[in-house]
Amino acid sequence: MSKNEFERIKSFFAPLAESFDGALSLKDDAALLSMEVGRELIVTTDTIVKGVHYIGDETPDFIARKLLRVSLSDLAAMGAEPLAYTLNIALPHGTPDNWLEAFSSGLHADQAEFGIHLIGGDSVSTPGPAVLSATLFGTVKTGEAVRRSGASLGDIIFVSGTIGDATFGLSVARQEINADKLDNKILEARYRLPQPRLRLGCCLKEAATAAADISDGLLADLGHITEASACGALINLENIPLSSGVRRLVDEDCDRWEKVLTGGDDYEIVFTARNQSCVADISDKLNLPITPIGRIVSGTAVDILNSRGGAMTFEAAGYKHC
């Protein structure tokens, strides 16, 4: 016989709250959060839906870890240190206890890796697909949060890691493309389990003028920066950093560049800064590739130049939530 809601909380989720006093062992109506003097609370929330944000063939522990990581990426973009989270899950009727046990083990693994703690939440049954939401809390020194609105004329635009891996990884998982076997494995892993750039975020507080995580696509998320900062951007296509697998795919078909620039789920950081040598030092310190891809310019458009200096246009700037 499956456990009831309260038995599931006691068995699978209460252990995740044991090390955080303010969680009150998940036995009160709400949790307690205290801020040190001189620190601000950063709050973000994300929802993932089966069949939309994850395919459904993933193991429950991977689903749990992706749920946390997409919001951890938001904290990273603002330079915040993870603190705690709440969890809301709507699961189909009849979801077995062993699914929840594996799901909670994934949460436990990433709590240990990223120093974050469960402090509350809710669970319900649904006749539809699984809907999973997490609200994350982080902290930053007062006035040090990196926002989208600080970019100014002449700033250099940088991006961490490589772009396009996750969107092609989704295509691999759906068997829509068939790349090299090793490329397939790497690209699919980038889609299924993103790596939030928390260490980079902490370093960017000293260097970046504006930042955003790349969840909806490079062009869309850079567009969020330019809109908030009331400026434009000029990007050089040949400077966009690609993994070897994505490079082979775009070399086979140059139309795939649109997917690189507008596909989401990379969870890298796009940011602006004035001091390129400072950013290079951060890259060396973290052993993380950080690439200059363009500059902030006047106007409001995000323009892309190809290798011949010609302007490129795309039908969509990135993923839009309906």
Model-identified regions with their sequence ranges:
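Extreme N-terminal cap/leader segments of soluble proteins
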Residues: 1-62, 78, 87, 115
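Glycine-/charge-enriched secondary-structure boundary and capping motifs
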Residues: 2-15, 39, 93-117, 125-132, ...
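Small-aliphatic-rich amphipathic alpha-helix that forms the alpha element of a beta-alpha
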Residues: 60-84, 105-113, 199, 203, ...
